[in-house]
């Protein structure tokens, strides 16, 4: 870890600053979004054990999973029900704070709930925000920006689900639709923002701010582990499986986890077989200089949140030394596991959120990986496997039933 951290270009202090900023905004969020009132305006998700799913996976794949299987329910985060509620909302808040501080309307010691007043709404309405997204990032940034008072435009790729676009429009967000994939939506969003000095473009491919918003999850998870009496150390390793699209969400979370747990946490990125952009970029060493389409892969997947053909060069280069591995899985496998999780645990997720669920059996089946790290049978028995569920809490019933029908 000591070797890898300098390459990120961000530090523990940067993550602490992000923590502090979210704490300053907590009184505002608690009033602006009723669903965050119970947690005092802190946007955090549950950590739950899923023993019935663990048994089901063992049965379906005839592969024992040593240790305990947990689920991190970012799928049910308040405000926008996805991991993007971490980074997306954080970057909008950071931008709003910067503008208000520069205008002399706010000091760091103020009660930030004053941002709900009409004068602030008026102030923020002079500014706009733009972002390119396959869905969830747009949802998070759109809902948050509109609530603060920004004019906001979300550039949506062809993969974006109709209900996500409809939800954004219901919040007064402008949605621009493209027939092409994620890369085009981001590029067009960037271009549109350049012509307007008052427009701030949130760059999912390169944003350090988004990355820091996600990284706060590390310390938060450490606190949840402590509350539940779970130990992470050399004898009790932690394996975390993160679905990966362009890389900002999983990259930021993995960075935060490394700061929180050091070398005792092992992070894996999971991608659809048709959109393995990060695996390709890291494996070839070309990062954002290569796309899956360059090698004849179509970037078409039911995992809309992961339908990215070209990875973030920033995340790939920053995180390559801090990750333990990558794997891919088919859409059908995601649908199957989506159904099993609903049956066994009563938890409903969108397809992309299941990408991490294939990880534990891959690690438990890979003797070469275990030997490379010198894991003993004892350590493997004491392992915690954490699947990061990235989205799905807002999926409409009708859409969810279609997903469930596709599982085997």
UniProtKB/Swiss-Prot annotation:
Required co-factor(s) are: pyridoxal 5'-phosphate
Q: Report the Gene3D superfamilies cross-referenced here.
A: 3.40.50.1100
Task: Tell me the domain of life.
Answer: Bacteria
Could you cite one Gene Ontology molecular function of this protein?
D-serine ammonia-lyase activity
> What keywords sit in the KW lines?
Lyase, Pyridoxal phosphate
Q: Which residues form the signal peptide?
A: none
Q: Which residues are in coiled coils?
A: none
* Documented EC number(s): 4.3.1.18
Its BP terms in the Gene Ontology are: D-serine catabolic process; isoleucine biosynthetic process
The answer to whether UniProt assigns keyword Lyase to this entry is yes
User: Which residues are annotated with the PTM N6-(pyridoxal phosphate)lysine?
Assistant: 84
Instruction: Report which reactions are catalysed by this protein.
Output: D-serine = pyruvate + NH4(+)
InterPro entries from the UniProt entry = D_Ser_am_lyase, Ser/Thr_Dehydratase, Ser/Thr_deHydtase_PyrdxlP-BS, TrpB-like_PALP, TrpB-like_PALP_sf
Q: How does it assemble?
A: Monomer.
Family the entry assigns: Belongs to the serine/threonine dehydratase family. DsdA subfamily.
Q: Which NCBIfam families match?
A: D_Ser_am_lyase, PRK02991.1
Q: Which PANTHER family match?
A: D-SERINE DEHYDRATASE (PTHR48078:SF9), THREONINE DEHYDRATASE, MITOCHONDRIAL-RELATED (PTHR48078)
What is the official name of this protein in its record? Answer: D-serine dehydratase
> Which species does this protein come from?
Shigella boydii serotype 4 (strain Sb227)
**Gene encoding this polypeptide?**
dsdA
């Amino acid at each position: 870890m000591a070797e890898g951290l300098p390459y990120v270009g961000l530090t523990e202090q940067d993550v602490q600053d992000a923590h502090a900023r979210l704490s300053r905004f907590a009184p505002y969020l608690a009033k602006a979004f009723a669903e965050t009132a119970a947690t005092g305006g802190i946007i955090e998700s549950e950590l739950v054990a899923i023993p019935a799913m663990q048994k089901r996976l063992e049965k379906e794949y005839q592969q024992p999973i040593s240790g305990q299987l947990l689920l991190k329910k970012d799928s049910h985060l308040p405000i926008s029900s996805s991991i993007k509620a971490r980074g997306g909302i954080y970057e909008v808040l950071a931008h709003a704070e910067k503008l208000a501080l520069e205008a002399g309307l706010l000091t760091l010691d103020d009660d930030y709930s004053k941002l709900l007043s009409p004068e602030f709404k008026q102030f923020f309405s002079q500014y706009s925000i733009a972002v390119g997204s396959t869905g969830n990032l747009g949802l998070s940034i759109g809902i948050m920006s509109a609530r603060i008072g920004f004019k906001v435009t979300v550039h949506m790729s062809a993969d974006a689900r109709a209900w996500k676009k409809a939800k954004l429009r219901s919040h007064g967000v402008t949605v621009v639709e493209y027939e092409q994939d994620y890369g085009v939506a981001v590029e067009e969003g960037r271009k549109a923002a350049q012509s307007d000095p008052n427009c701030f473009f949130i760059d999912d491919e390169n944003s350090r701010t988004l990355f820091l918003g996600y990284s706060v999850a590390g310390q938060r998870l450490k606190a949840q582990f402590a509350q539940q009496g779970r130990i992470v150390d050399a004898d009790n390793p932690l394996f975390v499986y993160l679905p990966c699209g362009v890389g900002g969400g999983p990259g930021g979370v993995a960075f935060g986890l490394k700061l929180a747990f050091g070398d005792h946490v092992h992070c894996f990125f999971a991608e659809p077989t048709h959109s393995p952009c990060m695996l390709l970029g890291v494996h070839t060493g070309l990062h954002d200089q290569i796309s899956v389409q360059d090698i004849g892969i179509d970037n078409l997947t039911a995992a809309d949140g992961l339908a990215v053909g070209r990875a973030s060069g920033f995340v790939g280069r920053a995180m390559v030394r801090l990750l333990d591995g990558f794997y891919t899985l088919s859409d059908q496998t995601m649908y199957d596991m989506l159904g099993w999780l609903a049956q066994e645990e009563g938890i409903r997720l969108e397809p992309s959120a299941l990408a991490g669920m294939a990880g534990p059996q891959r690690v438990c089946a890979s003797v070469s990986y275990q030997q490379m790290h010198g894991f003993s049978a004892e350590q493997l028995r004491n392992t915690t496997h954490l699947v990061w569920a990235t989205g799905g809490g807002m999926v409409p019933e009708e859409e969810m039933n279609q997903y469930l029908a596709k599982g085997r």
